[in-house]
Design a protein with these regions (language model features):
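An acidic-aromatic
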Residues: 53-110, 153-160
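Post-signal peptide N-terminal segment of mature Sec-exported envelope proteins
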Residues: 28-56, 77-78
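Flexible, processing/modification-adjacent segments and terminal tails
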Residues: 27-31, 35, 84-134
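C-terminal motif of bacterial Sec signal peptides marking the signal peptidase cleavage site
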Residues: 16-20
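Short, surface-exposed charged micro-motifs
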Residues: 49-52, 72-74, 135-139, 149
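Bacterial signal peptide processing site
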Residues: 22-25
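Gly/Pro-enriched, hydrophobic low-complexity segments
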Residues: 61-66, 117-172
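Bacterial N-terminal signal peptides that target proteins for export
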Residues: 1-9
């Protein structure tokens, strides 16, 4: 009888521990790193089509497809410098030399910010905040937490994210 009681007790503990596995908040936690997507961006007067990749380590790349004048350019950001790559050549700029209004810096500031609690709306899970004195609104899919759109009005930045998926390292 003692062994049965121990068995039942152990089973209850195991079930209790398993109930917590994989639990998510109802809105899904916002995913601001560790994802890749296609980004349709309106930045000032420029319309941009690019592939945005944010690694789990916090670095970011923006690979431009449009406008044609930027096609093939890849901007990288790791928090300490920005890299510009084109045709196998690469140039690194220290963070203090990168203008505050640079697209990659603006994206990195918003996606790298600590996000306060958001609000569920018809658009999705909306996170409003401020970084470097600029207000932003980041909309995430309520089920997955993956970004859907971003607005930074003061910078003239409006972005829509599609084909969004969790980041997979090429070496995996």
């Amino acid at each position: 009888m003692k062994y049965r009681l121990q068995y039942v007790f152990a089973l209850l503990i195991a079930l209790t521990l398993l109930c917590g596995c994989g639990a998510k908040s109802p809105a899904g936690d916002p995913v601001t790193e560790g994802f890749s997507c296609r980004a349709a961006i309106r930045y000032g007067e420029m319309d941009i089509d690019a592939r945005l990749t944010c690694t789990p380590e916090g670095s970011m790349t923006v690979a431009f497809a449009l406008p044609k004048s930027l096609s093939g350019v890849v901007l990288g950001w790791n928090g300490t410098d920005m890299t510009l790559e084109l045709g196998g050549m690469s140039l690194a700029l220290p963070v203090e030399k990168v203008p505050e209004s640079a697209l990659v810096r603006c994206l990195a500031q918003v996606l790298g910010a600590t996000h306060p609690t958001g609000t569920r709306t018809e658009e999705g899970y909306v996170i409003s905040g401020e970084t470097e004195g600029k207000a932003y609104a980041l909309v995430c899919d309520p089920a997955t937490g993956l970004p859907v759109s971003l607005s930074v009005p003061e910078e003239g930045l409006e972005a829509t994210f599609t084909e969004t998926q969790l980041y997979k390292n090429a070496t995996e």
